[in-house]
Amino acid sequence: MKRRKYFGTDGIRGKVGSMPITPDFILKLGWAAGKVLSRFSGGRSNYIIIGKDTRISGYMLESALESGLAAAGLSAALTGPMPTPAIAYLTRTFRAEAGIVISASHNPFYDNGIKFFSIKGTKLDNEVEHSIEIELEKCLTCVDPKELGKASRIVDAAGRYIEFCKGTFPAHLSLRKLKIIVDCANGATYHIAPSVFRELGANVTTIACRPNGVNINKECGTTDIRQLRAHVLAKKADLGIAYDGDGDRVIMVDHFGNKVDGDQMLYIIAREKLHCKQLTGGIVGTLMSNMGLVLALKQLNIPFIRSNVGDRCVLAMLKKQGWNIGGENSGHIVLLDKTTTGDGIIVALQVLSAMVNNCVSLHELCNDVSLLPQILVNVYCSSIKSPLESDLVRKETKAVEQELSEQGRVLLRQSGTEPYIRIMVEGNCCYGKILYLANRIASVIRSEIKSIQ
């Protein structure tokens, strides 16, 4: 298939005001997507659900999308700020033509993006995204005035989704004795996640739940848990839960302030499913998954397979294997027996149910999975030519791998959503040495970037 021009690993993303995140391009994207999605779904409902996170640019892009869809003859049903997985859920329950989310996930406020869901609440196939890109090359033509789309609002979207989330928590259990700190990253979960946990009985304290359009992910959320850790310790809470800007990722903190990442949550959920005789097959991780997770699952005789990085790759591998549970150490976890895409609230509820069901703390649930020291270093790279093709980078990478021997590994990759080279080094040695080795590779990559710019 031809290389895609606009779509990355998670929709279309970029800096607001620069191509492709401009009002004129997004309007045409709405038109092109409307034409293509109608074709693929057979025009069953004639409307598309649009949700967004809390970025100030969301209003502008929402209006542009709405106009483009109307020109293609499709109506827009607006939800306002809602988590990405909520749009996936609403799209399939409303039998909408498709769902669109305006969000750049964990990125800063000045970035934004567009991602699509099919009528089934799943990410679009490559074929559909390719067809949208072909349509974008055509001239925009408006339907007859009588066939123009309209806009409406789904007023009970939040309530519907809250009830859906609560329904994934065992009916015989309660969160009544738990004290939880919830960090909503000033993002799309701010009016959802606290309500879910409170309605299930938890004593909830919120932080980063006052979005103003420009504070999304700022010193909070899954990418910065310092504030959450401090509140958990100060309030003597049982645990803390952090979301990213659009709510498809979750990171937790135990009562000692220790970070609990996606790998540890995958282990907790898998073990609980195994004990309850509800585990289908094994677990799908990614190239970034910690060796500690692999070894812990092996102790339970649970199969483990790695996919490429990204929830799309995890989902593809789950489908291929016929399994239900997979995810990334970033906290993006997919539970296909519960929903169709990564959902931070639902994942947190499954971890909480394991705590309550076994009458143990989050810290105790993590006792049997010992993660190896792992470092992720990001190097900014806007160059079209990749420095990863350099002989010097390859030579340094090989030298580091030899130093780690069979006790570790190195992974270099270009991010699919941001202009960064990701350098992951993992090994069965002290943290300081892992950091030193990662920075050695980063230094060579930075030198190569300078030489090719």
Swiss-Prot record:
It comes from the Bacteria. It catalyses: alpha-D-glucosamine 1-phosphate = D-glucosamine 6-phosphate. The active site is at 105 (phosphoserine intermediate). The keyword Isomerase applies. It is an enzyme of class 5 (isomerase). Transmembrane segments: none annotated. GO terms for molecular function: magnesium ion binding; phosphoglucosamine mutase activity; phosphomannomutase activity. GO terms for cellular component: cytosol. The modification Phosphoserine is found at residue 105. Keywords: Isomerase, Magnesium, Metal-binding, Phosphoprotein. GO terms for biological process: carbohydrate metabolic process; peptidoglycan biosynthetic process; UDP-N-acetylglucosamine biosynthetic process. Binds 1 Mg(2+) ion per subunit. Its cofactor is Mg(2+). Its EC number is 5.4.2.10. InterPro entries: A-D-PHexomutase_a/b/a-I (IPR005844), A-D-PHexomutase_a/b/a-I/II/III (IPR016055), A-D-PHexomutase_a/b/a-II (IPR005845), A-D-PHexomutase_a/b/a-III (IPR005846), A-D-PHexomutase_C (IPR005843), A-D-PHexomutase_C_sf (IPR036900), A-D-PHexomutase_CS (IPR016066), Alpha-D-phosphohexomutase_SF (IPR005841). PROSITE patterns: PGM_PMM (PS00710). Mg(2+) binds at residues 105, 244, 246, 248. Activated by phosphorylation. Belongs to the phosphohexose mutase family. Catalyzes the conversion of glucosamine-6-phosphate to glucosamine-1-phosphate. PANTHER family: PHOSPHOGLUCOMUTASE (ALPHA-D-GLUCOSE-1,6-BISPHOSPHATE-DEPENDENT), PHOSPHOHEXOSE MUTASE. This is Phosphoglucosamine mutase. It comes from Blochmanniella pennsylvanica (strain BPEN). The lineage of its organism: Bacteria, Pseudomonadati, Pseudomonadota, Gammaproteobacteria, Enterobacterales.
